[in-house]
Regions:
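Short helix-loop capping/hinge segments that flank enzyme active sites or metal/cofactor-binding pockets
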Residues: 1-20, 182-188, 238-307, 362-372, ...
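Structural recognition of the beta-strand scaffold that forms the well-ordered cores
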Residues: 3-6, 39, 46-50, 102-106, ...
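A short helix-breaking turn/cap at a secondary-structure junction
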Residues: 123-205, 223-226, 269, 398-422
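Acyltransferase
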Residues: 34, 197-222, 243-253, 260-267, ...
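Glycine-rich, small-residue loops and helix-cap segments
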Residues: 7, 42, 164, 283-422
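Short, well-ordered beta-strand elements within core beta-sheets of diverse protein domains
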Residues: 5, 24-28, 145-152, 378
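Glycine/threonine-rich flexible loop motifs
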Residues: 18-26, 195-196, 333-342
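Gly/Ser-rich catalytic/binding loops embedded in alpha/beta enzyme cores
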Residues: 1-110, 128, 316
Length: 422
């Protein structure tokens, strides 16, 4: 069997607690595999252990530090050790990049598979929401959460998807089918961002794909509409309170926190929990009503309409596209326990398929100053096999640009034996 690692918000039947990175769940052993873990075991996978994560999948504080949890401390980025591994599937990304395993499970609500995969220089795939069961996984959102594979190669992600969907090799088989020469890809130019290295690598990727016969259309701008980001954040806070309370009610009696309210009180009393950042998101989520609220329904309708009918679906129809493409993210930032993440915005469009619930893959796109960059392909709902196959086509065209980690203490390190590239 192939050894794999599982993010510490996904339940496994063995003697490992599922903590979400919090001491409040240190006794969360429920003697059950989440359905995706059961399917992986049935296909011969060996669960090697759990990976650290951004605590509560990075949904506790607006000033959080990615890759830090009270239970396991700080995950490092193996390429440059004082740089963020991103999150929230931080440990899964770092472990795969380090070669501890060839595959791990991550989860994503908005960016939590794609960002750590990009910043650790590996492949990450976020499936269409609902394709994989979310049962027995600590939740944030009923409309955006999904588990997904984080792997060294695109084929690795296809193998994992075959196992988790019981698709009998159809994801892997689909890789060998030639993508038609008529394939047209929409370049989300508004998501290029300003990083020189990312843009250089992105332009090279376009040329490599053009050489293989792919056609491109530039999409200069797209606007999700007024009030979008406020509504998107609000939806998550509504859903978090509801889904977390439901989840906690299914845990064993040794888990003393039975609600978000209990959790807030636990954190106030346990100095290990709040020593680096606060629980501002918990507090504002607790104040909200349940999912029958008109405010919630209106906000959800707004964001789904923006990202689906007026977003990915509209763009693909309007320009007659097969896929959308953009850089995945800017290169990673410094780990900072004083001020939290300083994520460089402007690069990447992963929030669009995340909120829409549509498939998205990131594939290594080379490095800039020893830091990995990634290329994203996105598609319509249910286009999972095709999106993975497109990622594979790029991986083959580029000759696989995954770089082994160099474990540099910092980018600024200039010592004999360290070669700092441009």
């Amino acid at each position: 069997g192939k050894p794999i690692l599982i993010k510490d918000n996904v339940e496994t039947k063995d003697d490992l607690p599922t903590t979400g990175g919090s001491w409040a769940l240190i006794n969360n052993k429920n003697n059950r595999d989440s359905p995706i873990v059961k399917k992986l075991r049935d296909s011969g996978a060996v669960i090697l252990g759990k990976t650290n994560l951004s605590q509560w999948a990075n949904f506790r504080s607006e000033s959080s530090t990615s890759g830090w949890s009270a239970v396991r401390g700080q995950v490092k980025n193996p390429h440059v050790l004082n740089r963020s591994p991103c999150g929230s599937s931080s440990g899964s990304g770092s472990a795969v990049a380090s070669g501890i395993v060839a595959a791990a499970i991550g989860t994503e609500t908005n960016g939590s598979i794609i960002c750590p995969s990009t910043m650790n220089g590996i492949v990450g795939f976020k499936p269409t929401v609902g394709l994989l069961s979310q049962e027995h996984i600590i939740p944030i959102s009923s409309t955006q959460d999904t588990a997904g594979p984080m792997t060294l190669t695109v084929k690795g992600s296809a193998i994992m998807m075959d196992a988790m969907t019981e698709n009998d090799g159809s994801y892997v088989d689909n890789l060998s089918k030639t993508i038609p020469q008529s394939t047209t890809i929409g370049i989300l130019s508004f998501a290029r961002g300003g990083n020189i290295g990312v843009n250089k690598n992105f332009n090279k990727a376009i040329e490599e794909l053009k050489a293989k016969g792919f056609n491109f259309v530039e999409i200069e701008s797209w606007d999700p509409g007024e009030g979008f980001f406020e509504a998107a954040y609000k939806v998550l806070k509504y859903e978090f309170k509801s889904t977390l309370n439901n989840y906690l009610s299914t845990t064993n009696t040794k888990v003393e926190v039975r609600s978000l309210k209990d959790l807030i009180e636990f954190n106030k009393k346990d100095e290990r929990e709040l020593k680096i950042f606060d629980q501002s998101i918990f507090l504002s989520s607790e104040k909200l009503d349940d999912l029958n609220s008109e405010d919630y329904k209106k906000s959800l309708k707004l964001i789904l309409n923006a990202t689906r009918e007026n977003g990915i679906d509209k763009l693909m129809e309007q320009y007659n596209l097969d896929f959308l493409m953009a850089p995945s993210a800017a290169p990673t930032f410094l780990i900072d326990h004083m001020y939290g993440d300083s994520y460089p915005g402007g690069t990447g469009a992963g929030w669009i398929p995340a909120i829409a619930g549509y498939p998205h893959i990131t594939v290594p796109m080379g490095t800039y100053k020893n830091l990995p960059t990634g290329l994203s392909f996105m598609g319509r709902s249910g286009q999972d096999k095709e999106v993975i196959a497109m990622g594979y086509a790029y991986e083959q065209a580029s000759g696989s640009l995954r770089k082994r980690p160099s474990y540099l203490p910092s980018i600024e390190t200039v010592t004999s034996g360290y070669i700092l590239e441009e």
